[in-house]
Regions:
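Conserved ABC ATPase signature
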Residues: 105-109, 113
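Catalytic Walker B motif of ABC-type/P-loop ATPase nucleotide-binding domains
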Residues: 130-133
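Helix-to-loop junction immediately C-terminal to a conserved catalytic motif
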Residues: 21
Length: 220
């Protein structure tokens, strides 16, 4: 299932992801994944997740294949270099990049290509859960459509659970099964994508229509 979280800047969208990953401790309550708390084996917990970062977060000093295979080369169960490279090349192909890109460095690629590399890295270890943080920010409409299509295809193909943060309503409509509207750290509305346009929720209605008047203050 693909859940998309929408909401204005500073409403807590990225913080929500960081809380799930254990990077930020929630003020109250608890985080359950498949009905269970994080547990003591943090490495095993994090191994269930993949993440596409907003800015790509590629390592400038590593080649593209080394970026994609970064997790595969770490920890107790790290793979041999040759095996990790082969998996990286396979994932690069899956996101539409040729093998010739594998030995280049991030600075040699366009923004759209870097975003694809980030996506390849997010799926390299076959995670159960994938987080996408503003996946189309900074991309032109055509490349945004390409990334949205890839996200949708890969999530369905892998049978993964996906959670995406975005301001881009075209992305919401392209990749969401369900949507959650976050405001001031509170989920104001959640429901299937089919109910988005006629939710009856004043917060969601104001956000979708870009109106200054409504329960969301235009100046924060």
């Amino acid at each position: 299932e693909s859940m998309v979280i929408i909401g204005g800047s500073g409403t807590g969208k990225s913080v929500a992801l960081k809380c799930v990953l254990g990077l930020v401790r929630p003020d109250r309550g608890e985080i359950l994944v498949d009905g269970a708390p994080q547990g003591r084996d943090r490495d095993a917990f994090l191994a269930r997740f993949g993440m596409l970062f907003q800015g790509g977060a590629l390592f400038d000093s590593l080649t593209i294949w080394q970026n994609v295979a970064f997790r595969l080369l770490q920890g107790r169960q790290r793979l041999a270099k040759e095996e990790a490279r082969a998996i990286a090349v396979e994932k690069l192909r899956r996101v539409g990049l040729r093998e010739s890109v594998a030995d280049q460095f991030p600075a040699e690629l366009s923004g759209g290509m870097q975003k694809r590399v980030g996506l390849a890295r997010a799926i390299a270890a076959e995670p159960e859960i994938i987080f996408f943080d503003e996946p189309t920010t900074g991309l032109d409409p055509i490349m945004s459509g390409v990334i949205n299509d890839l996200i949708r295809e890969i999530v369905v193909e892998m049978g993964a659970t996906a959670m995406t943060i975005t301001h881009d309503m075209s992305s919401v409509r392209a990749i969401a099964d369900k949507v959650a509207m976050l405001h001031a750290g509170v989920v104001q509305w959640t429901g299937p994508i089919a109910d988005l346009e006629h939710s009856g929720d004043p917060y969601l209605d104001q956000f979708l229509n870009g109106r200054a008047e409504g329960p969301i203050e235009a100046v924060r």
